[in-house]
Amino acid sequence: MLQTHQLNKLYRKSCVVENLNLRVEPGDIYGLLGQNGAGKTTTLRMLLGLVKPTSGQIEWYGHALTRPLYGRIGSIIETPGFYPQLTAAENLELHRRMSGIPEKGTVMEYLKLVGLEKAAHRKAKQLSLGMKQRLGIARAMMHRPDMLILDEPINGLDPLGIKETRELIVDLQRKREITVLISSHILGEIQLMASRIGIMHQGRLIEQLDYEDIQGKNRHYLELKIDDEKRTAVLLERELHLTNFQVCEQGMIRLYEGFQDSGAINRRLVEAGIEVKELTIQTDSLEDFFIRATTRKELA
């Protein structure tokens, strides 16, 4: 659907996006992850024609992405802005007229779609940040695009606003069969909605795979919560000959081998006088995968 080939962006002599080969398939909720400064926003701006690439190509269904095709993409880059003295409905009506959208019923249709029909006559300055984000999504959807590009849409929202925005994005993809490309550094939320993940680091796309593949690559481990992590580490290594473990924080160790025999491990720790507060089999999170991927790249 949307694909880039060796996309580069240089500002003076600084390369902020390097040899980017991004591929978004129809129906994806594609999570573009990266720390602040990784090149995510610059990438989205290039995809939308707001920033000209230094080199490389952008394709839409195998054809060069040209100005007429941008009408098939809706977007929010940074925080959506509205006229504060106008109501939610008036802001959308103004956008409808300026965009040449003929259907007058579109305003209420999309306010209802994002759950803001009861706030239609509230002024924009009275809306919460989460409500403004949903209003921005409504505005981006009014011309019925095939794809929605969202830059950090949950950044700065409170927990309720994050939940509402996440559920809205998932609902739009399911009911409208729209493709979504969403950038974020909040990994836990992307984990709850994305079907495909790309990880950017220092301007490069270092990973791109289906979320199911990430789950297959994630490691299983035995999480030990104990009263003395130092004594536990010594016992694991010297007596049980287990060396693939990580002391995560005070009172917690992750064991990546031998955890199938968790009963014997627990028994030996107790015999040694170590209090085992909790012992559970866990799986790496998306955050763990992200840290491993970016750390490997820095060490390479």
Regions found by a protein language model. Give the residues of each.
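Conserved ABC transporter NBD signature motif
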Residues: 49, 56-71
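Conserved ABC ATPase "signature" region
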Residues: 93, 102-119
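Catalytic Walker B motif of ABC-type/P-loop ATPase nucleotide-binding domains
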Residues: 148-152
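ABC transporter nucleotide-binding domain
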Residues: 166-256
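Short, charged/small-residue-rich alpha-helical element at the C-terminal edge
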Residues: 220-293, 300
